Amino acid sequence: MIKYTVLPEQKKVIAIVTDCEDDVIKTIAKNMPENLYFNEGAYKLKHSYKGIAKCHPDDEFDEDLGKKIARNRALIKYKFAYLRKIDLFSMGLLKWILDTGEKGDTCAQYIESLALELKDKTKTE
C-alpha cells in the first residue's frame, strides 16, 4: 500500500510504501516446498519505505507529478531491499545445496573406501 502526504506550502510530496515487511517471506513460502524451513526473521523487510519529491522554488508545484516522482523513489527503495533479501535467500539456498552435495560426495567416497578396504581384506584372507 502506498500512502501520500502532500505539502503544497513546502512544494513537497511524500510517498510511503507500507505493510511490506513480510513480502519476501510470502514470496519464498509461495514458491518453495512446504517442508522447507528457513529463518523468517532474516528475510523481513523494513515496515515502510519513503520517497520524497521536492519542487524547485522557481518551478510551479504539480501534485500529480510530485506523487509520481515520490512513488517511484519509494518503490525503488522497496524493490532494491526486496531483491537484496531474495538474493540473500538464493545464495543461502545455493550454499546449502553445494554443502549438502559435498557432504554427500564425502559420504559416498567414505563408503567406497570402506568397500575397497573390505575387498582388500577378503583378498588377503
Please provide the spans of the model-predicted regions.
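Catalytic phosphate/metal-binding cores of nucleic-acid and nucleotide-processing enzymes, i.e., regions
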Residues: 1-124
